[in-house]
Amino acid sequence: MNIMFKFVGNLNYNTTKNMENIDWANLKFGYMPTDYNVRCYYRNGKWGEIEVSSSDVINIHMAATALHYGQEAFEGMKAFRCPDGKIRAFRIKDNAERLQSTCRGILMPELPTELFEEMVKKVVKLNERFVPPYESGASLYIRPLLIGTGAQVGVHPADEYLFMIFVSPVGPYFKGGFATNDYVIIREYDRAAPLGTGCYKVGGNYAASLAANKMAHDAGYASEFYLDAKEKKYIDECGAANFFGIKEGKYITPKSSSILPSITNRSLQQLAKDLGMEVEVRPIPEEELSTFEEAGACGTAAVISPIRKIDDLENHKSYVISKDGKPGPWSEKLYTHLRAIQYGTEPDVHGWTTVIE
């Protein structure tokens, strides 16, 4: 496809941001204004040209379907400044394909992979001064967002859409970084219905998790831990991340239609195979938690968050997975290999990274 760019609004650098005052090594996982974002509108049945904007606000119709009927999808990915001086983004195409799956699920127009990739490259390049230095351990978080902007009062798909990408430098999702965390099983809330939108990355799934997440935090846990919504027997997700368990040289992760297919989890499965592990994707009953030698939550934000224990307060059980409170050897190997690929210090034999030029 023929991709065109145009600049809109005031395109000067964000001069209020003094780069020398950024403490790269102690960044939180949060929003920081950067210089530019990129946008593309879908109108009259086709995608338009890419717009580059320095404004961090959008104008939206009060009857837009994104506001009333949940026509909203997003992705999460990262770019890294590497020791060789290059900037690499991780698995752009896979994020494009997952967004396309979400679009099919909630009846939004699919964004062509080529357009998605070009916009990711453009927004990272425009904001390259905000990509944290390698030694900081931080990264540039990339947030693609697609919303229905067309007005509807009845429950119908919009006829117009806005796709945009903004970026923000971020530190670790959990304060301790690659360190063990405690989780608690929450049965009072479900993240997603069995035949609902759990396998799509839509905002409604995260809104449904807010109350459970607050309960977990108020009780002193890192995050909530979900069982399946239908029977409350099988492991679903760790808050906003996928679960994996390790035992007897096997990497085991849940199989469920209500779980978001994590690109990080898929990467870890491949790396586990590369390390000689067996990989099993299958339903995992809650009781099996007591048999795991290691376990973790995985996703773009956290990468791997090793699990120390999972408490089932309702049944007065505690599944202690890390006896010494430290990440297990397999988790450490997987984390080290994945980070090495992302930072370009290990050969990218699977073609996961894209150098931003």
Question: What spans do the regions from the language model cover?
Answer:
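Helix-start/capping segments and mature chain N-termini
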Residues: 2-123, 145, 152-357
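Extended, Lys/Arg-enriched charged tracts that mediate electrostatic binding to polyanionic substrates
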Residues: 132-147
